[in-house]
Amino acid sequence: MKIIIQRVKKAQVSIEGQIQGKINQGLLLLVGVGPEDQEEDLDYAVRKLVNMRIFSDAEGKMNLSVKDIEGEILSISQFTLFADTKRGNRPAFTGAAKPDMASDFYDAFNQKLAQEVPVQTGIFGADMQVELVNNGPVTIILDTKKR
């Protein structure tokens, strides 16, 4: 899995002009699923995400997790994280998991994440418009194959 983590003051996702998911302070996740991803990748990602200390404490240090601040997560599927840009000018996306596998894996990821913190989502494979107010900004890349 490849996940772009953005610390946000608020975020929302809309599909065809209708708000699908909306959060206040928390994390916006752009989630890509790879063909080799397994249950252990899912567990690792959830554990890291809910415990990653990237929110400021009273002294201004990044010392609090999304769980500590009682924040929320907006999770958006993003197969383009597996783009291959080595040849030509058009990215190839053959490195991403096939849609059926990726959809099931993304759903399982969100369900497991929702056991820890409130989660809103987009719709897998939909054309979505994502709006966010970055906080920091703080943007982190999590790759479950690099641990």
UniProtKB/Swiss-Prot annotation:
- What are the subcellular locations of this protein? Cytoplasm
Q: What Pfam families does the database record attribute to this sequence?
A: Tyr_Deacylase
Output the superkingdom of the source species: Bacteria
Its EC number is 3.1.1.96
Catalysed transformations (reactions): glycyl-tRNA(Ala) + H2O = tRNA(Ala) + glycine + H(+); a D-aminoacyl-tRNA + H2O = a tRNA + a D-alpha-amino acid + H(+)
- Keyword Amino-acid biosynthesis part of the UniProt annotation: no
Q: Which UniProt keywords apply?
A: Cytoplasm, Hydrolase, RNA-binding, tRNA-binding
Entry GO MF terms: D-tyrosyl-tRNA(Tyr) deacylase activity; Gly-tRNA(Ala) deacylase activity; Ser(Gly)-tRNA(Ala) hydrolase activity; tRNA binding
| Predominant localisation class | cytoplasm
From the UniProt record, give one GO term of the biological process aspect. D-amino acid catabolic process
Per UniProt, the short sequence motif Gly-cisPro motif, important for rejection of L-amino acids occupies residue numbers 136-137
GO CC list = cytoplasm
Q: Which InterPro entries match?
A: Daa-tRNA_deacyls_DTD, DTD-like_sf
Subunit-structure text: Homodimer.
This protein's domain notes: A Gly-cisPro motif from one monomer fits into the active site of the other monomer to allow specific chiral rejection of L-amino acids.
Record function comment: An aminoacyl-tRNA editing enzyme that deacylates mischarged D-aminoacyl-tRNAs. Also deacylates mischarged glycyl-tRNA(Ala), protecting cells against glycine mischarging by AlaRS. Acts via tRNA-based rather than protein-based catalysis; rejects L-amino acids rather than detecting D-amino acids in the active site. By recycling D-aminoacyl-tRNA to D-amino acids and free tRNA molecules, this enzyme counteracts the toxicity associated with the formation of D-aminoacyl-tRNA entities in vivo and helps enforce protein L-homochirality.
| Similarity comment: family membership | Belongs to the DTD family.
What protein is this chain from? Answer: D-aminoacyl-tRNA deacylase
**From what organism does this protein derive?**
Streptococcus pneumoniae serotype 4 (strain ATCC BAA-334 / TIGR4)
